Amino acid sequence: MEDFVRQCFNPMIVELAEKAMKEYGEDPKIETNKFAAICTHLEICFMYSDFHFIDERGESIIVESGDPNALLKHRFEIIEGRDRTMAWTVVNSICNTTGVEKPKLLPDLYDYKENRFIEIGVTRREVHIYYLEKANKIKSEKTHIHIFSFTGEEMATKADYTLDEESRARIKTRLFTIRQEMASRGLWDSFRQSERGEETIEERFEITGTMRRLADQSLPPNFSSLENFRAYVDGFEPNGCIEGKLSQMSKEVNARIEPFLKTTPRPLRLPDGPLCSQRSKVMMMDALKLSIEDPSHEGEGIPLYDAIKCMKTFFGWKEPNIVKPHEKGINPNYLLAWKQVLAELQDIENEEKIPRTKNMKKTSQLKWALGENMAPEKVDFEDCKDVSDLKQYDSDEPESRSLASWIQSEFNKACELTDSSWIELDEIGEDIAPIEHIASIRRNYFTAEVSHCRATEYIMKGVYINTALLNASCAAMDDFQLIPMISKCRTKEGRRKTNLYGFIIKGRSHLRNDTDVVNFVSMEFSLTDPRLEPHKWEKYCVLEIGDMLLRTAIGQVSRPMFLYVRTNGTSKIKMKWGMEMRRCLLQSLQQIESMIEAESSVKEKDMTKEFFENKSETWPIGESPKGVEEGSIGKVCRTLLAKSVFNSLYASPQLEGFSAESRKLLLIVQALRDNLEPGTFDLGGLYEAIEECLINDPWVLLNASWFNSFLTHALK
């Protein structure tokens, strides 16, 4: 066979084929059939291009004799046969000058008349099988495929054969001649049988035995064997006319594909109704801390000791009174509960030795606030299955709420920097591998950007409260334990600081299942007057409990100090996730890292340092009614972190549904922006699925309003 190849083909073609095989580590002397196949393919590519020119008028003409006077341009650019680097250079320059989409794999030719790349195939098997393999391999709508066989058959994309009859006849004749020459030397059978399919990564996986029988049984109707089903699936053109495909499906499926244009999408409908209220477990921007610097008191680190020490830093306590009642609650009970906390803290101080934990007396006000004896009595099903009118409680539909401005303010605050650091730079050992080195550099840069962020304070506060509450729920199931809400940080000067936000009193907590609820009463300090945005504090009873002297530019001013009290509840699973809120740092770091990776792959070097240190560059942060908001890389880090933290603090079924459903619409809009001409069916159904999640949750409503801003700007 090797001798035949050297005799039958032009020496230049033989040389190119040898070079190509060596590039892939193959030996022409051993893999002789492959050698012959490569030479054949090369020759057909050259023949395809031969004699085809474009004249001054841009018309395609055929010139067989070399007329030296004609100013002619070759119609085809030959890419096959060049070394890879050169071939890609040619492809890139064609794409740059013509604006044609760059193919993923190297094609064989470029046609300057039709402005498209061409993939030439020469097969010893059936043309349509080989065509499908090629199409599956290159997966590009834009590259034109033209297959020839040694038996004179051909197949091309959309039956558009590019060349005139005569030129194609020359190619078919040459292939027929090669086949006869091989046959006369007894080489054809071996050559014909040696052709493998297009080698894609997915090698055919043979199924035998029981699995094979199951596969044959579970074929869709009208398929006789797994093979012909496979062939059908391989040939299923996903971007072909979808209506045609649907008609092959079931008679029940009817979907009209509507083009999705700039004018198609409408904004999401946000609900009307009273303004939405705060529903997080802890207060955020309105929280006030009583703090001690450089704590060194006896029992430092024991929450109760720390709390008492923090309480003693404040001297403005006064007789508490209700300034904003809770609409549905028994407000005097909230007032009595706070007075009880003060009294019991005073009792502790009068004792010889302060205990490590404090269980509150089970007074009537606490029993009421913690829902003691309020749960309906559980009855065994056996005892009541004969009751004729046994039914589940009618539950009310949730009341719709409209978006209030406070939630955007909460988010803005969460992105801001505080004057304290809330996380330590983790002391992790020496890096062993270079990738670890890059990772720790990135981590250090990221930590520097977010360690002082208010969202990071919320993480540490959330972790502390959930851990303390879960511990107490397990350790003191029957007790009304008093749990201080504490956080720790470092000041600018590096001094340690312990902060008290208020207290929680836990109810009975026999938590068997993950979703069993433990009730608690939270009491949180604040300087925010609840009468400014009463709708935000709907679920709270607010007391005025003291006056605080604040240093301002004009000297000291006295401000009333408030206590926000409410009944709340949580479960084991929610506390478990709350304890793991530090994951938010990881999630936002990974998002930043993918931005760095994208930059690095464009520049072909690690861009970590430039990414964080180029202070002049701004990055898109999000969309507001004003347009696309931009900011420094630090601001991007903090915004991503705040989003992740709010997803945790405001986790809810409404958020789950909204995120999943709105993502689909987002992908369609992005496809439109990328000029991919998306089509949709039942867009109304998608809008319904998104909008049924827009009920009353402040964080979901804010995200929906951001989504509307995005739609407006994306479709301009």
Swiss-Prot record:
Annotated disulfide bonds: none
GO biological process: cap snatching; DNA-templated transcription; symbiont-mediated suppression of host gene expression; symbiont-mediated suppression of host mRNA transcription via inhibition of RNA polymerase II activity; viral RNA genome replication; viral translational frameshifting
Note on cofactor: Binds 2 manganese ions per subunit.
Cellular compartment(s): Host cytoplasm; Host nucleus
Short sequence motif Nuclear localization signal 1 (NLS1): positions: 124-139
Positions annotated to bind Mn(2+) 1: 41, 108, 119-120
Gene3D superfamilies: Influenza RNA-dependent RNA polymerase subunit PA, endonuclease domain (3.40.91.90)
Cofactor field: Mn(2+)
Keyword S-adenosyl-L-methionine attached: no
Predominant location: host cell
Binding-site residues for Mn(2+) 2, renumbered to this chain: 80, 108
Motif (Nuclear localization signal 2 (NLS2)): 184-247
Classification via InterPro entries: INFV_PA, PA/PA-X, PA/PA-X_sf
Post-translational modification: Phosphorylated on serines and threonines by host kinases, including human casein kinase II.
Stated family: Belongs to the influenza viruses PA family.
Subunit field text: Influenza RNA polymerase is composed of three subunits: PB1, PB2 and PA. Interacts (via C-terminus) with PB1 (via N-terminus).
Function recorded in the entry: Plays an essential role in viral RNA transcription and replication by forming the heterotrimeric polymerase complex together with PB1 and PB2 subunits. The complex transcribes viral mRNAs by using a unique mechanism called cap-snatching. It consists in the hijacking and cleavage of host capped pre-mRNAs. These short capped RNAs are then used as primers for viral mRNAs. The PB2 subunit is responsible for the binding of the 5' cap of cellular pre-mRNAs which are subsequently cleaved after 10-13 nucleotides by the PA subunit that carries the endonuclease activity.
Protein name as it appears in the record: Polymerase acidic protein
Organism annotation: Influenza A virus (strain A/Swine/Hong Kong/81/1978 H3N2)
